[in-house]
């Protein structure tokens, strides 16, 4: 039987959103490693921590959640989890945490290396596991940890009292970092960073909203890849430019009757929760083979922070999916389903 000849992969257009976003995501880890070599402070940051703080202060950042997802997607999640479990961590705690704690011990992983941190920036508007995870990292690495307590909101709207509470912590975190590393806050730089962050967020949220068209101009699994940029680089100028390119491509796909979903779109679903990174391809192909397009997810939009003032920025960080009450959580999902003509949920 003749051997199957694989067709060479078509090179990615360097002007495409896929190329630009892939480069930004790939450069994020490399940039932090280079910064470390140059003596620039490096922070490990939880994904919903206000990126405006380290970006304004010039602190290099790396995101353990993003690293853990990459390691898992490349097939090394179990190996790293085994390292953490051998040190006594239970196998029923967060796999992100186990991979990260294992990396803190080994300080290397060929599937995704990252610069070791000088400080940890943590917030609990994602999950309370994050606090214990980062506390253990701080202990194991003997470095400071700064936490923003962004509490669960039992009310529908963010109160003035909550804005005041979180705002005070925001500035306290700034002052701690200034003192730790001899840095100085720059209001003009902060204004620039917030502009970059909002530009990227608006384009991203507009791009994800293009699923309002039937058929959708994109495969929803694209969002799970592209959102890495919103986690790691939304405060950078190049993120906004790349997201605007993505939005432009999705709009053109709609006008041209094309899509990155390479099958007939028979059904449209919403994906709930975190992607199963080790089985992302199996999930994507399993749905596509049945004509099912995952057109929206609460997860992807969670990393778009659009605001027009400091208080609105604080409210945005207090309004991420895991920090809001049941009624608001329900209404967000209902809106996504109605806006994007969803027929089922996974």
Place the predicted regions along the sequence by residue.
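An N-terminal, globular interaction/scaffold subdomain
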Residues: 44-113, 118, 126, 133-134
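A polyampholytic, Gly/Pro-enriched intrinsically disordered region
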Residues: 85-92, 164-176, 314-322
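Proline-aspartate-enriched helix->loop->beta-strand connector
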Residues: 117, 337, 341-346
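A charged, amphipathic alpha-helical module
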Residues: 2-41, 167, 171-299, 305
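Internal, well-ordered alpha/beta segment that forms a basic, Gly-enriched binding/recognition surface
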Residues: 103-105, 110-210
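Redox- and metal-dependent alpha/beta enzyme cores, enriched for Fe-S-associated oxidoreductases
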Residues: 55-85, 270-340
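Short, flexible loop segments at the rims of nucleotide/cofactor-binding pockets, characterized by
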Residues: 19-22, 94-101, 320-326
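Structural motif
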Residues: 42, 118-119, 268, 344
């Amino acid at each position: 039987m003749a051997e199957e000849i694989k067709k060479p992969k078509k090179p990615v257009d360097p002007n495409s959103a896929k190329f630009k976003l892939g480069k930004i995501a790939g450069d994020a880890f490399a940039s932090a490693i280079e910064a470390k070599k140059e003596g620039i402070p490096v922070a490990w940051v939880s994904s919903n921590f206000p990126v405006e703080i380290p970006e304004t202060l010039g602190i290099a950042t790396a995101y353990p959640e993003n690293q853990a997802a990459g390691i898992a997607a490349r097939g090394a999640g179990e190996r790293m989890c085994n390292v953490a479990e051998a040190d006594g961590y239970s196998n029923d705690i967060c796999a992100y945490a186990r991979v990260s704690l294992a990396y803190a011990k080994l300080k290397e992983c060929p599937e995704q290396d990252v610069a070791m941190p000088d400080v940890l920036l943590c917030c609990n508007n994602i999950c309370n596991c994050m606090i214990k995870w980062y506390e253990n990292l701080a202990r194991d690495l003997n470095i400071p940890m700064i936490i923003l307590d962004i509490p669960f909101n039992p009310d529908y709207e963010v109160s003035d009292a909550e804005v005041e509470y979180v705002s005070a912590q925001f500035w306290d975190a700034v002052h701690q970092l200034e003192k730790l590393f001899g840095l100085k806050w720059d209001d003009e730089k902060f204004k620039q960073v917030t502009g970059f962050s909002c530009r990227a967020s608006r384009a991203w949220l507009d791009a994800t909203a293009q699923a309002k068209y039937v058929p959708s101009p994109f495969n929803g699994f694209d969002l799970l890849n592209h959102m890495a940029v919103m986690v790691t680089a939304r405060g950078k100028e190049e993120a906004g430019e790349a997201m605007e390119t993505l939005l432009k491509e999705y709009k053109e796909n709609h006008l041209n009757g094309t899509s990155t979903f390479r099958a007939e779109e028979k059904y449209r679903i919403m994906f709930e929760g975190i992607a199963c990174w080790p089985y992302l391809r199996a999930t994507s192909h399993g749905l596509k083979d049945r004509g099912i397009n995952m057109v929206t997810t609460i997860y992807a939009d969670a990393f778009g922070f659009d605001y027009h003032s400091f208080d609105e920025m604080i409210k945005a960080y207090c309004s991420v999916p895991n920090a809001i009450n049941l009624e608001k959580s329900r209404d967000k999902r209902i809106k996504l389903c109605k806006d994007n003509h969803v027929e089922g949920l996974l």
